[in-house]
């Protein structure tokens, strides 16, 4: 009797299949994209527009700059962590936004400038924060495009040039601090570029260190022997940095070709021409 009940209970009616338990898909956090990045950049612009206010002293503006840098950095850390960007704790994701904020704040503290110049600097700051972080975000999602490398190089170069000009034209900074600042700016910007060419932190840091040392040595020579203004020297230093780091990036990436050597070598030739022109002229140009 029991065997009959067991066989009847185990037998299903014809046409009816035994239902399989469905496995629930793993819950994946919603990825954040350009809307979040645009909102973060807009908040940075809104806060940065207050840097030119006459109600703040320079020390208070520096404190506000540090606070804005921390705010933007934490926002980008949350963005990359939520999207599971590879190596989201690496400093190269946050170098350009922080340097851009410092450059915009320094322009805002210039007393002789009209309010439109600091406002334009803050707007450019917001666009650079968005562009540089968008490149990192797209690269982390596997959506890298050829234009992204141009955006990365353009934002890094422009911020580098602005900071070089600010440091060189500052009369309050001692000479030692000027060259130290140039070294740090070139080091961080170079590390940002070299991290795109290699995943090894040591190689990127060593390449950035050599690039920064070369640029700082060139700055010392030009400030000492060239009778030129800060704008002229800043342009030469930025071109020299761009040529050196460009050749090094492609050498690390194993993509160095004759065309690339010609393109970056052209910047080196321009630097040599500008230095020779200043030496021959012997007076400020422009």
Regions flagged by a language model, labelled:
Residues 226-228, 248-259:
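Membrane-helix boundary connector in multi-pass membrane proteins
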Residues 103-111, 160-172, 216-232, 271-286:
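Hydrophobic alpha-helical transmembrane segments in multi-pass integral membrane proteins
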Residues 62-71, 118-126, 178-188, 231-242:
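Hydrophobic core segments of alpha-helical transmembrane domains in multi-pass membrane proteins
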Residues 31-38, 85-97, 137-160, 176-183, ...:
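Cytoplasm-facing juxtamembrane segments at the starts of transmembrane helices
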Residues 98, 213-214, 233-248:
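Hydrophobic alpha-helical membrane segments
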Residues 74, 192, 243-247:
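Transmembrane alpha-helical segments that form the membrane-embedded catalytic/substrate-channel core
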Residues 43-47, 98-105, 157-166, 187-191, ...:
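Hydrophobic, membrane-inserted alpha-helices
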Residues 1-142, 257-262, 269-286:
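N-terminal topogenic module of multi-pass integral membrane proteins
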């Amino acid at each position: 009797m029991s065997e009959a009940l067991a066989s009847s209970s185990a037998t299903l009616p014809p046409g009816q299949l035994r239902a399989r338990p469905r496995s629930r898909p793993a819950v994946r956090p919603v990825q954040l994209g350009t809307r979040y990045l645009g909102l973060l950049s807009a908040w940075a612009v809104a806060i940065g527009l207050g840097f030119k206010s006459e109600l703040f002293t320079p020390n208070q503006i520096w404190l506000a700059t540090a606070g804005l840098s921390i705010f933007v950095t934490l926002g980008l850390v949350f963005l990359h962590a939520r999207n599971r960007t590879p190596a989201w704790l690496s400093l190269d994701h946050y170098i350009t936004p922080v340097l851009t904020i410092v450059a915009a704040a320094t322009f805002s503290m210039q007393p002789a400038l009209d309010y439109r110049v600091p406002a334009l600097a803050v707007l450019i700051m917001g666009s650079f924060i968005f562009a540089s972080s968008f490149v990192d975000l797209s690269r982390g999602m596997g959506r890298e495009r050829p234009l992204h490398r141009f955006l990365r190089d353009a934002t890094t170069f422009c911020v580098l040039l602005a900071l070089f000009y600010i440091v060189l034209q500052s009369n309050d900074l001692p000479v030692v601090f000027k060259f130290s600042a140039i070294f740090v700016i070139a080091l961080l910007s170079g590390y940002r570029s070299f991290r795109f060419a290699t995943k090894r932190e040591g190689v990127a840091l060593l390449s950035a260190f050599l690039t920064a040392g070369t640029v700082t040595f060139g700055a010392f020579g030009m400030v000492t022997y060239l009778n030129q203004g800060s704008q002229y020297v800043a342009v030469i230093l930025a071109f020299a940095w761009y040529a050196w780091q460009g050749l090094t990036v492609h050498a690390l990436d194993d993509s160095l070709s004759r065309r690339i050597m010609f393109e970056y070598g052209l910047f080196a030739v321009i630097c040599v021409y500008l230095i020779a022109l200043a030496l021959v002229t012997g007076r400020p140009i422009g």
